[in-house]
Amino acid sequence: LGISAFNLPHGFCIVDDIVYLTDREDSVCLKYTSDGKPLMVLGERGVHSDIGCEKTGDLVPRAAGPFNYPSEMFPAPSGDLYVSDGYRNSRVHRFTKDGQLIQSWGVPGKEAPGEFHLPHSILIDEEELVYVCDRENSRIQVFTPDGEFITMWTDMTRPNDICQSKDGDFYVAESSFQGSTPGISVRDRQGKVLARWDSRSAHGLWVDSQDNVYLALTGAESVDKYMRRD
């Protein structure tokens, strides 16, 4: 892809051999072929929406349109693109496959459904339900494709990333909070914990077709792999 193409790449994922990621510092979302051919840029490089705050990670005074330090872009089966806009905003944005904004939802907050404090990762399942890692609120919120709140999972600490295995189970990378140990939790479709183990603190994770788990460690600048044992 070329190192000069990015300022701070974030939220990297591959779906159907297409690469999706954000450039957090430049406030753009990017789409590439697997061999690095640019397909789409959402946003204007270096132009950040006005949320009344310039400190990354703080609870922002107000929500705004796309983008201000977006954290991840993920495609839905329909082709729509969803973005968690994240580090200096508190919204989810939904676009057509051609990059036209359909809608946005979310406001800054710490408790109520639809309130976010650093939506850090986003996942769309085969039913087009939207899962948002509301990291600084230590929960995952689940929405319909139109942004209607369904439920939230709260038995976790600072979820950095979420992905889904081929069997439909969800894997969540949880980071430490107030002395807790970072780890990985495996959950069913209702959010019930099926398994949990301690790990190094992962900023991102992915599960392959064999249910092996890969953790991206920003602090250690490395990748850990966990192999499934049947």
Indicate where each model-derived feature is located.
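Conserved beta-strand positions in repeat-built beta-propeller and related beta-rich domains
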Residues: L21-R24, V83-G86, V130-R135, F170-Q178, ...
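Short loop/turn segments that connect beta-strands within beta-propeller blades
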Residues: T33-K37, T96-Q100, T144-E148, R187-Q190, ...
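Beta-propeller domains
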Residues: Y82, G86-S104, P108-I150
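Structural signal for beta-propeller blades
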Residues: S27-L30, S90-V92, S138-I140, G179-I184, ...
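Blade-level signature of beta-propeller repeat domains, shared across WD40, Kelch, NHL, RCC1
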Residues: R200-D230
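A short beta-strand motif characteristic of beta-propeller blades
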Residues: L1-I3, M40, G57-A63, Q103-A112, ...
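Short loop/turn segments that connect beta-strands within the blades of beta-propeller domains
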Residues: V15-D16, E25, S34-D35, P77, ...
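Beta-rich, blade/repeat-based domains predominating
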Residues: S4-I18, I51-D80, E111-L129, S138, ...
